[in-house]
């Protein structure tokens, strides 16, 4: 039985706080800075009245907006800006945001959008896996509760294949369990 009678009370995403579209792959540092300054002006207690009267036009690319009854703090705006300004933090935040939205939305639709949600799917970070760098390419592995010490195994080429999504679902080689591994691609 699902609950649909009450609207979920969620905090706005960093993209909603800064009135930016998600995902925003082509977002420049200048666009981010402009959005940050607009958000500060819009939500600052001393400036909010003046900005509300201006009724600024929205952009054509369909930015996400927080619910109008949400109170956005200056600290939240600053945190959003700092997180989205750092490429590594932003990639991690985007992954977590996608994962959370998949859980809320039932993890995909009948058109193949989104990912399939597996009940009991354990989500881990690549750093939580053991790494074996001997041989032609690095291998990451993790023990499964079925007893196989290297039940969940993946190679560097597996990670490269899924670099755009930053996540990969791996099945145990000894049983029917799956785990989702999250990772970030770092440019050297």
Curated annotation (Swiss-Prot):
One of its GO terms (biological process) is protein histidyl modification to diphthamide. CDD domains: DnaJ (cd06257). Pathway: Protein modification; peptidyl-diphthamide biosynthesis. It is found in: Cytoplasm; Nucleus. It comes from the Eukaryota. Keywords: Cytoplasm, Iron, Metal-binding, Nucleus, Zinc. GO terms for molecular function: metal ion binding. InterPro entries: DnaJ_domain (IPR001623), DPH3/4-like (IPR044248), DPH_MB_dom (IPR007872), DPH_MB_sf (IPR036671), J_dom_sf (IPR036869). The keyword Transcription regulation does not apply. Its main location: cytoplasm. Zn(2+) binds at residues 144, 146, 172, 175. SUPFAM superfamilies: Chaperone J-domain, CSL zinc finger. SMART domains: DnaJ (SM00271). Transmembrane segments: none annotated. One of its GO terms (cellular component) is cytoplasm. The keyword Zinc applies. Residues 120-184 form the DPH-type MB domain. Residues 13-97 form the J domain. PANTHER family: DIPHTHAMIDE BIOSYNTHESIS PROTEIN 4, DPH3 HOMOLOG-RELATED. Belongs to the DPH4 family. Required for the first step of diphthamide biosynthesis, the transfer of 3-amino-3-carboxypropyl from S-adenosyl-L-methionine to a histidine residue. Diphthamide is a post-translational modification of histidine which occurs in elongation factor 2. This is Diphthamide biosynthesis protein 4. It comes from Emericella nidulans (strain FGSC A4 / ATCC 38163 / CBS 112.46 / NRRL 194 / M139) (Aspergillus nidulans). The lineage of its organism: Eukaryota, Fungi, Dikarya, Ascomycota, Pezizomycotina. The gene is dph4.
């Amino acid at each position: 039985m699902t609950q649909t009678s009450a609207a979920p009370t969620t905090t706005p995403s960093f993209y909603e706080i800064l009135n930016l579209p998600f995902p925003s792959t082509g977002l420049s540092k200048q666009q981010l800075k402009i959005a940050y300054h607009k958000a500060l002006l819009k939500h600052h207690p001393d400036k909010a009245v003046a900005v509300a009267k201006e009724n600024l036009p929205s952009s054509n690319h369909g930015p996400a907006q927080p619910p109008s009854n949400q109170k956005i703090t200056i600290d939240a705006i600053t945190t959003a800006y700092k997180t989205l300004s750092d490429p590594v933090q932003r990639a991690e935040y985007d992954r977590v945001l996608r994962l959370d939205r998949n859980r809320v939305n039932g993890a995909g639709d009948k058109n193949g959008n989104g990912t399939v949600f597996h009940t009991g799917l354990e989500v881990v970070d690549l750093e939580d896996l053991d790494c074996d760098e001997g041989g032609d390419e690095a291998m990451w592995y993790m023990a499964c509760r079925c007893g196989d010490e290297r039940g969940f195994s993946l190679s560097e080429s597996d990670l490269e294949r899924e670099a755009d999504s930053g996540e990969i679902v791996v099945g145990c080689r000894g049983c029917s369990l799956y785990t989702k591994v999250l990772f970030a691609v770092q440019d050297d």
